């Protein structure tokens, strides 16, 4: 059993906290921390077991380090904004705490994300005897594990890899994102990159469209090629890959609203 600190009290933070609370044999103590502690308390009230909450500015390394040193968790699960990955990693190094996140770092003022900034921490975490587990959501995360599994158990080499992210549900809203709206819009409107013969090739955002029929009667969906961070890590660790692409489905209503936001200058 161990103590975990979850940083971030948005939609993803709420889901992570609920899941950790269901596993007391693994997470014996939970601390949920955010810049706005009232959001943490609102999540805590929904749970079947008590957890602690705290206020912290994840951009402030000394403040976060002090909280980590006070609480001494075994692990930090970072589900704050990707802009804050590096400061949280710095605080974990200073306090001697293992680190996990679900999305790689991107600068606040530039819609560009890549692993180089976080991979640069590798030696420091290794020398400190700490673990930093990056991209541990579904995509990236589960998609990486699926790839590793088939590479180990089914194929001698992987030459082409297509990751297709389809949401088979319908929440009924004309426009709503599944995670932080700002990050979602930045991701969708960024230049597309896919791996082709040893290098990344850039194409305009959402310019490549295809139709995909999901198995088990889920349905047929329009999918669009876009860049996603696991393409960077998978092509690094599986050098036999000649082509790697990431695709995501979007409904017509979502695309219509996104176009309006672009036309009025709210996505740049």
Regions found by a protein language model. Give the residues of each.
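Hydrophobic/small residue at the entry helix of a nucleotide-binding pocket
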Residues: 12-15
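Rossmann-fold NAD(P)-binding glycine/threonine-rich loop
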Residues: 103-130
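Conserved Rossmann-fold cofactor-binding substructure of NAD(P)-dependent oxidoreductases
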Residues: 58-72, 80, 84
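Rossmann-fold cofactor-recognition segment
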Residues: 47-60
């Amino acid at each position: 059993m161990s103590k975990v600190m979850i940083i971030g009290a948005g939609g993803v933070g709420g889901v992570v906290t609920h899941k950790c609370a269901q596993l007391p044999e693994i997470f014996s103590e939970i601390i949920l921390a955010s810049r706005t502690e009232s959001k943490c308390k609102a999540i805590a009230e929904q749970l079947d077991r008590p957890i602690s909450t705290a206020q912290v500015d994840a951009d402030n390394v000394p403040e976060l380090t002090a909280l980590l040193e006070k609480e001494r968790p075994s692990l930090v699960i970072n589900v704050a904004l990707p802009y804050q990955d590096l400061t949280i990693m710095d605080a974990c190094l200073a306090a001697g705490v293992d680190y996990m996140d679900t999305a790689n770092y991107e600068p606040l003022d530039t819609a560009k994300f890549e692993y180089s900034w976080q991979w640069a921490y590798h030696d420091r975490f290794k020398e400190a005897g700490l673990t930093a587990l990056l991209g541990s959501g579904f995509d990236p995360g589960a998609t990486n594990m699926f790839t590793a599994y088939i590479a180990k158990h089914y194929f001698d080499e992987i030459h082409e890899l297509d990751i297709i992210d389809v949401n088979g549900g319908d929440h009924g809203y004309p426009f709503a994102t599944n995670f932080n709206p700002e990050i979602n819009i930045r991701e969708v409107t960024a230049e597309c990159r896919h791996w082709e013969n040893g290098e990344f090739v850039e194409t305009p955002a959402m310019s490549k469209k295809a139709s995909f029929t999901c198995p088990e009667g889920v349905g047929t969906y329009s999918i669009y090629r876009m860049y996603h961070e696991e393409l960077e890590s998978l092509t690094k660790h599986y050098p036999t890959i000649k082509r790697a692409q990431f695709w995501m489905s979007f409904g017509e209503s979502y695309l219509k609203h996104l176009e309006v936001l672009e036309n009025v200058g709210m996505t740049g």
